Amino acid sequence: MTEMFAIFVEPFQFSFMQNALLTALVVAVICALLSCYLVLKGWSLMGDAISHAVLPGIVLAFLAGIPLVIGAFVSGIACALGVGYLKENSRIKEDTAMGIVFSGMFAIGLVLFTKIQTSQHLTHILFGNVLGVSQQELIQTAIIALIIFILLGLKRRDFLLYCFDPSHARVAGLSPKLLHYGLLTLLALTIVSTMQVVGVILVVAMLIAPGITALTLTNRFDKMLVIAIISAVTASLLGVLLSYHFDASTGACIILLQAAFFLIALIYSKIKVRLNF
């Protein structure tokens, strides 16, 4: 028992591990909450699109000498607006528009990045570096997360109605277009805050895995939120510990655990259905 406690406590004697854990936990909660809405709306590809599209914004922000999160956020919103414009003003379907917009923006980002940065910096942006999070970056992530949490709390029922049935939301006196872009804005903010943990490539997993894990286990939205948060927080905590003891990528460990939790939930739900019959 003492040995197990030592294994758990040992990493957190270092300040960089404390920052990493706190950042991962904060991001896990926000991703889990938003994940439930994205899964219900069927926006998994939208999360992937915006997460890749932030790269040129990061590069341009670096060149301009402004905070990278500002560039990432603006770039993410530009991607969302671009997809919306193509969908409304052409015969292109939304998923096709996402594919061309995010791949084009990601390619622009890669070209720009190779001209001004080394491969080491590129790896940091693509795959994240939560172990390198400073106290200032932790506070910045916490502030962004708090904004997202408050907005989701205030508009929880409106977003839920929009995700289930936009037509019903319109009849209820809500603006589906406003809710659409509001949810996209929250998605862009979440991606910006998550980028430091798992990078732009793996961020979509943190935005989808908690939601589909919860949806596999329950049909009630309130319960879904709780399960998503528990699975995401547990994966982040264990992922940070595993990455320390096995000298592995922290972001990858977190994503692997979330994938494992989904598989366990899927198997459990199948067994439960068979037993009921």
Where do the protein language model's features map onto the residues?
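Helix-loop-helix "hairpin" substructures at the membrane interface of multi-pass membrane proteins
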Residues: 138-210
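Transmembrane helix-bundle core of multi-pass membrane transporters
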Residues: 4-19, 90, 97-157
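Short juxtamembrane and helix-loop transition motifs at transmembrane-helix boundaries
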Residues: 6-15, 29-40, 57-67, 158-168, ...
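Small-residue faces within membrane-embedded alpha-helices
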Residues: 24, 28, 32, 59, ...
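Loop-to-transmembrane alpha-helix initiation sites
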Residues: 20, 68-76, 95-99, 142, ...
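Cytosolic-side transmembrane-helix boundaries in multi-pass membrane proteins
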Residues: 251-277
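Short loop segments and helix-boundary regions at transmembrane helix junctions
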Residues: 36-118, 214-226, 243-246, 269-271
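Transmembrane alpha-helical segments in multi-pass inner-membrane proteins
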Residues: 201-252
